[in-house]
Amino acid sequence: MKSRLGLLAFGTFLLGIGAMIHAGRQAVPAGDTVVLVTLDGARTEEMFGGLDVDILASTLKAGQKLEELPVYKRFWAPSPEERRRKLMPFFWTLVTEQGSIAGNRRLGSAVQLGNAHWFSYPGYSEILLGEPHDAEIKSNDPIRNPYVTVLETLRERLSLPSDKVATFASWSVFNEIVEHTEGATYVNAGVEPLETPRTDIHLLNPLQAEAATPWDGTRFDAFTFRAAMAHLASARPRVLYVAYDETDDWAHDGRYDRLLESFARTDTYLKDMWNWLQSQPEYRGRTHLLITTDHGRGHTASDWRDHGAKIEGAQETWIAFASPRMPRRGEWRNAPTLSTSQVAATLASRMNVDWNAERPRAGRPIH
């Protein structure tokens, strides 16, 4: 009898331990969602000051007048605050009324890259790992990430199906960047067809293949946005990453007019996504949005097209937040310097996952 009672007690103990472990893995408010959005190579100058008139003037062709350019008429205003609101009206309403943004150095707030390379793959890997790996991640080649990313860990810790952790990216190399184990999460990057039950989205698949961009392995951001929204509506992910690319592509091409237009389009994408999320009961008041960039660019008319370790300014980034569990502080002022390495832990913390327990060297979460 004692043996049977002992076995029963031991079994109850094991069940209790199992429940505690399960609770630890699932310790997140039901329905909470994190959304990460990146704007490739988006300079602090445009984010905080809108149109840079010196750079626009440097792109004038013979016979052109600055005041006659369509983008000047559309985006110019006397003050940086007015110009940035003309460029990204929704974004600035969101971060000033419902969130915050760090990185305006004029106000004593800075965000820095931790990696030494100051270009895309190292920057994105730093975002998703919470730490730089300069010796191993030192090119933009499509090489599988040697480390497990925060996206993969969130899927495992929250016991989610792969389609509940999804990445939509304009650049094809995100297939390798976001996963150490191929297929661990859902990834749609570059000119990949979207698998969806929605017949209206099926029309996008041949269209994005036919609408070739000037850049190899990259689709236009409009397709990335539509694909992400289709997946959001049909699969209802808990972790979503949307990576836009045109803010970098047009800069490399020296098309400052197109660059400004891409900022403005991205603002409409953010608006449409945020408004849709807030219209859905399962996402309203439960969605944690973080917006940032993988690197900065040069400060001047001679180097704004470029980035990399030799370009001063390319290490300067910014981070914006809209979260029900973060203070609504608008622009950060006179604050300690933040690092891009803190993004991974910040995302994980919103789902009550301790990323620093997984990667002790990673940056700490931002609160």
Predicted regions mapped to residue ranges:
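Active-site-proximal N-terminal segment of extracellular/periplasmic enzymes that hydrolyze or transfer
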Residues: G24-S100
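Active-site His/acidic residue clusters
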Residues: H180-E182, R226-D272
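Long, well-ordered early-domain segments
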Residues: Y72-V178
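Bacterial N-terminal signal peptides
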Residues: L8-G18
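Histidine-centered active-site microenvironments of extracellular/periplasmic hydrolases
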Residues: S58, T292-A322
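Non-catalytic, well-ordered alpha-helical segments in soluble enzyme domains
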Residues: L151, R155-R157, R325, N334-H367
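Acidic, His- and aromatic-enriched active-site or binding-groove loops in soluble protein domains
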Residues: L129-R144, A184-F220
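Metal-dependent active-site segment of extracytoplasmic phospho-/sulfohydrolases and closely related
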Residues: V34-L36, T44, R265-R305, L347
